[in-house]
Amino acid sequence: MTTEKKSYALPIAMMFALFFMIAFVTGLPSPMGVIVAKQFGATNFQSQLGFFANFIAYAFMGIPAGIMLKRVGYKKTALSAITVGFIGVGIQFLSGEVQSFTVYLIGAFVSGFSMCMLNTVVNPMLNTLGGGGNKGNQLIQFGGSINSIAATITPMLVGYLMGAEAGRTIEKANPALFLAMGIFALAFIVLAFVKIPEPHIVPKAQIKEKDPHGPMSFRHFILGTIAIFVYVGVEIGIPSTANLLMTQPLTNGGLAMDAAIAGSVVGTYWLLMLVGRLLGAVVGAKVSSRLMMGVVSSLAIVFLVIAIFCPLDLTVSMPAMQSEGGFSFALVQVPLSVMFFVLCGLCTSVMWGSIFNLAVEGLGKYTAAASGLFMVMVCGGGILPLIQGFVADKTDYISSYWVIVVAVAYMLFYALIGSKNVNKNIVTD
């Protein structure tokens, strides 16, 4: 038994690497949006198209990825996802060589297919490699922490590589893209030569009984899918627009801040999400998902409204990385509004888990199908920031956060009212 556990150490390490890659590649459109705004003269709407291209892939691949997992198993699904991810990042690198915004968007779209497939496979695969139970859950939680660390590092790294505004080109981000392709290549090589248990492959000939009901038969689940849709958009839109606000020139309504400093501030948002998840894990056993969701949604609305009405010339000190004079950290002055946007990371950190728990409560045998539909609704991470970018073009960056306020208000409604199961008459055993 000991030997078998040791034999899984390497694939487990590769799963952790893939957890890192999910956040790293998913987070790239934020700093890349700053780059394309400068290099291609993209509007705020256009600069968010990277997120749209990345997340809209979930709408196409969410359900097929789940079917693929059942048909061919963990290993082949993971290897396929890694291959697609390598190609997607490679296309983004190529976009810098040919100076093409369209090629960049194609790369982001292909990368989105990979991220959807990886999100489908890494959690159950890591749980299986850990032997299930507490050990499997422990590995998943550790993987989630690595995911948060990657989300923190991405804007900081690319922001540092960007340097001064005049030199913001995709080519400057090449070291980050090479790192991503290198990790993908290493993970592929390791997983290709390692045996992995496949407990959940479903034979093609298996006959499925027809069921008159499904997850969409439950009102609280339908409303929950909308909540997930807007949640992912909120999680992405808050830091992404803040990054644009800080880095864009004064003539475009921005603050013309150093990209490395802005990246560090945005990185703090993702770091606070890690802190929030750890706190959520501690209190989760004592506090209901409904109460937790209600509290964090209310707090997020308070933070957002304060940020919107705070004058931009009112500043506060925050720790940040500087690109001038080499790699260094220092306290820098940032608008108080930005600080409150960053604090929203504490609130968004526990929203996914809370919404998921509320939406699948009472679904019983329909829970697996519900998970696949949830993955489809992740596409909200590409659509809501696009809407926010459009509003920013028509008004200004700060005013665009009213889009986020409306989305969070819906999540508060879902926590207090929409999450109640009114279809308890449906048999779910």
Residue ranges of model-derived segments:
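Extracytoplasmic gate region of multi-pass secondary transporters
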Residues: P29-S30, M216-G267
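Helix-loop-helix hairpin linking two adjacent transmembrane segments in secondary transporters
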Residues: G136-K195
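Conserved MFS/SLC helix-loop-helix module at the cytosolic interface between two early adjacent transmembrane helices
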Residues: F60-T102
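Intracellular juxtamembrane helix-capping segments at the cytosolic ends
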Residues: M117-G131, T348-G364
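Central cavity-lining transmembrane alpha-helices of secondary-active solute carriers
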Residues: L49-I67, G267-L279, G380-I383
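Hydrophobic core of transmembrane alpha-helices in multi-pass small-molecule transporters
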Residues: F101-L118, P319-M351
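C-terminal ends and interior cores of transmembrane alpha-helices
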Residues: T83-V98, L299-A330
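Extracytoplasmic
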Residues: L10-A42, N119-N123, I238-M246
